[in-house]
């Protein structure tokens, strides 16, 4: 239940922020992404659980955000990475306010110098531990 809630919450936030949302393994990105900007959520990984009937479940979450146009100048690419970074911070900040989410911890954002798909895009990837309660 928490896993499904988490996926749906990220979907709602990313979609409201103007992203086309996708979720699956990374190997399927090129064939599934149809429009940009895109948000690609890898399936959340169950990390740990505390409690029996009530408690916490922690998931490792990886979210890629991508913008079309890999053929940007270096200055334009830097501006796009900066914007994507800000948008990832906003997505995870909003996620921390979701009903079943206790906290978003250890948020890390990295920029990729190569494309994640065969389409050609600028991408940034966020990883975080998301603590939910049940």
Which residues make up each language-model segment?
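Charged, amphipathic alpha-helical segments and their flanking helix caps
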Residues: 1-30, 44-134
């Amino acid at each position: 239940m928490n896993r499904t809630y988490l996926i749906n919450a990220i979907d709602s936030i990313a979609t409201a922020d103007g992203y086309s949302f996708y979720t699956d393994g990374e190997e399927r990105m090129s064939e599934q992404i149809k429009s940009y900007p895109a948000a690609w959520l890898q399936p959340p990984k169950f990390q740990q659980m505390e409690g029996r009937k009530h408690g916490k479940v922690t998931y490792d979450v990886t979210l890629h955000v991508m913008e079309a146009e890999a053929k940007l100048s270096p200055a334009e690419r830097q501006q796009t990475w900066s914007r994507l970074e800000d948008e990832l911070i906003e997505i995870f900040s909003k996620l921390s306010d979701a009903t079943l989410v206790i906290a978003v911890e250890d948020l890390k954002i990295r920029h990729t110098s190569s494309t994640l798909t065969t389409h050609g895009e600028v991408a940034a990837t966020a990883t975080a531990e998301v603590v939910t309660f049940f």
